[in-house]
Amino acid sequence: MLSAITNTSPIDNEFFIEDSRVYFCGIYEDTLLKGVSPTDFHCWHYWGKGSSSCYMGGIRLRGADAASFQALNYAYAMDISAVYTTSGRISGADISTFQILDNGQNDFGAPQGYAKDKNNVYFHNGDGKVKVLKTADVCSFQSLGDTYFAKDCRHIYAYGKILPKADLNSWKLIGHLYSCDDTHIYYVNRKINAADRKSFRLYTPLTAPSFCDLLARDDNNCYINDEIIEESYWLDRLKRVKDECMSE
């Protein structure tokens, strides 16, 4: 995935060349990679390496082996002796069996995703250390591809946590982080206790931009995410969502 650097102008979360030097374009400032030559620098999004050093954005990965370093996806990279996330190394990961399970990027463009080795299942959301899913069955565990939801032979997982009381056989995705089984409605990894399963309906279009409000309702309540709100406010938010969809 790593290829020779070609950018000559700043692009958010990308490396670029200026005045024969390599920089990383961060959200708030550009970072100079000291001592790095653009002639042998290879990169992919915010993973990069020179002849003797490796980088996650503008941060040098201490001890990383440049010869074997490779980007696996947006959330994970590895070399001959370690696995890296955008928050640092995964302690104890088995290099020979480590595998990514999705593309490592959520719908907001942030690094996030599931991975596993012969011993453990991992979830990384770009905020803090990677989470080890200690109850997960390694052999049967699979990501559902959106970096939020996953399952194994015993449980459904959402954002790295077991979905409470979810029935494995009847569970399905509704859309926009909502899901359900025969008796429950969920938002991400939280059960919406007040929701009526039979009448619950998602109103935010599946094609809506990721920043739109997530709106749903049933016969009894109106919801934004998993919060009950007044119908008048809900209708106003729904109009805005529809307007945002029309403007896309």
What function would you assign to each model-found segment?
Residues 2-248:
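Non-catalytic tandem-repeat scaffold regions and their flanking low-complexity/translocation tails
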